[in-house]
Structure formats: C-alpha cells, structure tokens
C-alpha cells in the first residue's frame, strides 16, 4: 500500500510537469508562429523550408534549440568571467550587458543562422529580436546574479 501511494504521488507530479511543459511548448509555438507571420508580413524574413510536418518541426526546432544553447552558453560563460574578475570594469553594469548581447548575437548569427539556408532573416532583424529578449530579461530579472539565494 505504501508503494502504491508513492507511485500515485509520482504519477501526479509527473503529470503536472508534463501538462505544464506541454502548455509552455504550445504557447512557445504559437508565439514563434506569430513572430514568423509578422516577419513574413513585413517582408523581414523568408522561411523557405516546407516539407512534411515532422521535417519542418526538426528543421525549425533545431534552429531554436541551437539558438537557445548559444544563449545559455554565452550567459553562463559571461557570468563565470564576472565571478572570476569582479573588479574588471568590462564585467560590471551596462558594459557587461552590451558585451553579452553583442557576443550572443554575433555567435548566433555566425554559428547557427548562417548554416540554415532556408531561413532568410537579415542581421539587423536578429539584432532587434535578441535585443528585445535581453531587454525583457533585464526588466523581469533585473538582478540575475543571485536568483536562487545561494550563498557561495
């Protein structure tokens, strides 16, 4: 009976994670679909890859996932440098944010975007999109150095 209770609790927690993850991915998909429609409407982008549903999912999904990993790696690397060099003026304040934004944008463009031949988005549009994401990050997470209250 004890194991049945643990199994039931595990299934409930797992179902909550699966349902919330599915809702998040659905909203992310609708948001990216809306963004792509806006970019196409204003002739700022062209998405020429149009195969089957799963092929499109893998092609465009890998573009998004690689972009996210690029952002994640640069953010963590810059935070690591900030912790190792706390007195350096380049790793403080607005200069730090501008360096992080510039490195992220350039690496995304030259490592990820340039290899996807069916996605045609101008560099300045990518700069604008990533810039809006960084501004939202600073608005909603203004002091990102200690979000989890960890004292190290």
From Swiss-Prot:
Gene source species: Staphylococcus saprophyticus subsp. saprophyticus (strain ATCC 15305 / DSM 20229 / NCIMB 8711 / NCTC 7292 / S-41)
Bilayer topology: Multi-pass membrane protein
Function of the protein: Involved in multidrug efflux.
Protein name: Multidrug resistance efflux pump SepA
Native organism taxonomy: Bacteria, Bacillati, Bacillota, Bacilli, Bacillales
GO cellular component, one term: plasma membrane
Transport as UniProt keyword: yes
Pfam families, per the entry: SepA
Keyword list, A-Z: Cell membrane, Membrane, Transmembrane, Transmembrane helix, Transport
Main location: membrane
Family indicated by similarity: Belongs to the multidrug resistance efflux pump SepA family.
Localisation per UniProt entry: Cell membrane
């Amino acid at each position: 009976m004890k194991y049945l209770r643990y199994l039931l609790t595990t299934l409930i927690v797992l179902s909550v994670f699966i349902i919330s993850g599915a809702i998040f991915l659905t909203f992310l998909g609708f948001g990216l679909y809306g963004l792509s429609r806006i970019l196409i409407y204003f002739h700022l982008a062209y998405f020429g890859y149009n195969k089957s549903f799963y092929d499109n999912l893998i092609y465009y999904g890998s573009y998004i996932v690689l972009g996210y990993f690029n952002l994640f790696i640069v953010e963590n690397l810059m935070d690591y440098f900030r912790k190792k060099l706390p007195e350096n003026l380049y790793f403080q304040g607005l200069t730090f944010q501008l360096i992080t934004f510039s490195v992220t944008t350039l690496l995304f463009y030259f490592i990820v975007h340039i290899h996807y031949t069916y996605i045609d988005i101008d560099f300045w549009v990518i700069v604008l999109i990533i810039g809006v994401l960084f501004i939202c990050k600073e608005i909603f997470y203004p002091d990102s150095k200690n979000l989890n209250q960890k004292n190290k």
